[in-house]
Amino acid sequence: IGDICGVPYEFIAWKDYDKINLFHPKNDYSDDSVCTFACAEAFLEGKDIAERLKNRCLADPNRCYGLGFRNWLSKPGIAPAYNSWGNGSAMRASSAGFLAKSEDECVDLATKTALPTHNHPEGIKSAVATALAIFYAMHGHDKEYIRTNVLNKFYPKWDFYTKGGYRNVTAFIGCFIKTYYL
């Protein structure tokens, strides 16, 4: 839902969060939803994640895929990972947090979602941190536990203004921790 409602505001330095229209006429799913579904399908059907990512994304080419990811998609077969540390690995890792039965399995599944393209250590870390936050929330841990075991563990100097994929990870986990609504 957040991905769909956020599409009209992507790449805009939006400040008036209270004025976001959740029913904006330009709401649509993005590349992040396509990749998220591809990873979930791969896990649920026992398929290769890289193949599923490539097939799903090529079947839905008009999403806002990043340049490195588009280059990866355009190569024949399954191309090697390109060492990305952007936010794509975090954006598609949620199924690992939902489907894992243990913390170790969550880390393993999240790593698998990152590796086809985001094999840089920071790319993997972003996927793992995202999935673990979801895993902990799904298993009843409170926000302080998530802060301690995700933000403080993976990003001890976190703030909302860092670079790379972890910028998004620290921002969305930080927002989750600070909100009164969840």
Model-derived features: where do they sit?
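Structured, active/binding-site neighborhoods that engage oxygen-rich ligands
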Residues: I1-L182
